[in-house]
From Swiss-Prot:
This is Circadian clock oscillator protein KaiB. Pfam families: KaiB. Coiled coil: none annotated. Stable from 4 to 40 degrees Celsius. The lineage of its organism: Bacteria, Bacillati, Cyanobacteriota, Cyanophyceae, Acaryochloridales. NCBIfam families: circ_KaiB, PRK09301.1. SUPFAM superfamilies: Thioredoxin-like. Changing K43A: Loss of circadian rhythm.
Length: 108
């Protein structure tokens, strides 16, 4: 039986439809579709339309990307254009490498 894959729950906080917001979403979608296709959920939150959500989650700047699940919560604030920095910042790159090493060794 194949092992269950983790589902990654992410929130992207943006401020309207600005060039920075559009670029952050496009870049993030590219990374997620390439690296985590089918095992992630992304919620985009416009802090101009939903300021209460930003306040509840203590978001002070945009764009902010938060990995909610699996724990621990991790955040990246600002530029999301560097794939490796995004994956490392969210603590996803090391999991990816660890999972690949386990696959190579036949571990579960």
């Amino acid at each position: 039986m194949a092992p269950l894959r983790k589902t990654y729950v992410l929130k992207l906080y943006v401020a309207g439809n600005t060039p920075n917001s559009v670029r952050a979403l496009k870049t993030l979608n590219n990374i997620l579709e390439k690296e985590f296709k089918g095992v992630y959920a992304l919620k985009v939150i416009d802090v101009l339309k939903n300021p209460q959500l930003a306040e509840e989650d203590k978001i002070l700047a945009t764009p902010t990307l938060a990995k909610v699940l699996p724990p621990p919560v991790r955040r990246i604030i600002g530029d999301l254009s560097n794939r490796e920095k995004v994956l490392i910042g969210l603590d996803l790159l090391y999991e990816e490498i660890g999972d690949q090493a386990e696959d190579d060794l036949g571990l579960e």
